[in-house]
């Protein structure tokens, strides 16, 4: 399958083009060599968003013969996105993500026979692999049965992809809030001011005064002539 995009009449777009468009909000998360730079929760959010975009792209396809190459290339990008989502869920300890991924694997397993008819194998670990010869030669009507807007497989996948993305967003928001709290300076604690110690009252020694003694003085008479 060609990975070259030809712009013009009857434009053919590569699977890499579709993969980049699915990861447009988190472009580097769609690149294998860059995924290690993301946290598990960031990957879960990116993969959930990308899978929802992949579903929207596939369900908007007309599955006509002149768009056969684009349809197949978009399905190849869907397979990569789906596998990325299972990978990020597998490395997460969050039970909600694990449950959503498990449900998606169960749904895909239910359609393993239909997928096999267009050259897509559901592996034991739940991931998907395309078998080139059958994938490129299978009738587009069989692709439509699985990936059109009316297909139950896409409708059910869309539901759990949305849950996966919503949970990833909540986890990333929580991580960012914790990071902000760690970066905030701690409030300065002023030393507690204590009142000066009260002076210890000094004991006053009381000394008894001697009793007053009354002294008698001789009377003096003054004569004043009239």
Each language-model region and where it sits:
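Polar, low-complexity export/assembly segments characteristic of proteins
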Residues: 1-226
